[in-house]
């Protein structure tokens, strides 16, 4: 997910996106703990996506 794509979204859509990504991160951590995670690279990728959304949210609120 690119920051340029995120800048086109509204604040409400960005907040919803953060919730979705946090839920996905929780599920990935759970899969990792139970040994079911096939692609471990998705964990840092999801964390970075959350950080990108937070950055764009802060920019829009300023």
Swiss-Prot record:
GO annotation, cellular component aspect: cytosolic large ribosomal subunit
Amino-acid biosynthesis is among the record's keywords: no
One annotated GO molecular function: structural constituent of ribosome
Keyword hit for Cell division: no
Pfam families in the cross-refs: Ribosomal_L29
InterPro entries listed in its UniProt record: Ribosomal_protein_uL29 (IPR050063), Ribosomal_uL29 (IPR001854), Ribosomal_uL29_sf (IPR036049)
Alphabetical keyword list: Ribonucleoprotein, Ribosomal protein
GO annotation terms (biological process): translation
Protein family membership: Belongs to the universal ribosomal protein uL29 family.
HAMAP family according to UniProt: Ribosomal_uL29
Protein name: Large ribosomal subunit protein uL29
Name of the gene: rpmC
């Amino acid at each position: 997910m690119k920051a340029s794509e995120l800048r086109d979204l509204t604040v409400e859509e960005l907040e919803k996106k953060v919730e979705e990504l946090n839920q996905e991160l929780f599920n990935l951590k759970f899969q990792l703990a139970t040994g079911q995670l096939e692609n471990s690279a998705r964990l840092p990728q999801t964390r970075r996506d959350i950080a990108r959304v937070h950055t764009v949210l802060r920019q829009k609120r300023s």
